[in-house]
Amino acid sequence: MFEVEQIKGIIFDYGGTIDSNGEHWAWVIWDAYQAHEVPVSKEQFKEAYVHAERFLATNLVILPEDNFHVLLQKKIKIQIEYLIDKGFLTEGKKTEEYSIGISKQCYTFAREIISKEIPLLKSLKEKYPMVLVSNFYGNVQAVLGDFKLLDFFDQIIESAVVGVRKPDPKIFTLGVEALGLPAESIVVIGDSYEKDIIPAQKNGCKTIWLKGQGWGKDNESATADVVITDFVKLEEIFKLS
């Protein structure tokens, strides 16, 4: 049972939670592909998306100083290059415009989402210590700084820095240790059942699942202490209003 009165600290996921209100970033980017009328199928896009993620995980492309707009420009460029290499797209001026337009649309999407959440995050910060635990590319500090989010978190646990990635429960153990509180008095808030909720539960934390359009199908039995479909519902859960 989730009793907010027992909560003394909060661990937040970042990507897919704070910056997209539960929607997997693959689908945010796919929506931008469609808006820019990129002539590829959803399956071709998924191939390119996976390729880019794997490439970024194994190559030093994202620099520590890159904000989210720069990150997106680099990521979309890799996707477009893959689609050209595979013969799904024909290289030309239009393909250059795709990278620019899609990255701008996605960055604007994130900025608008976050701007609506900042008052809520400020209210939470006034009541609770908060730690961020994120699988990211080594530039999450620059991303948070650009979005004016850095001051909300007492500590940031980033996979590329600590050498542990979700769904390994150890990365959440680091978050619990950073808060210095009993795990049962900490709630983890994230959008991924596999990468956030399960490892948080293994640490003994309470969980709030921001359930949106994920990458694949969720296990039908998947659950958390609280399930929400909109970030702003946290205001009600934490009795902030």
Task: Explain the meaning of each model-derived region.
Residues 1-10, 43, 90-93, 118, ...:
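Asp-based, Mg2+/Mn2+-dependent phosphohydrolase catalytic module
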Residues 126-127:
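Structured helix-beta-strand junction loops
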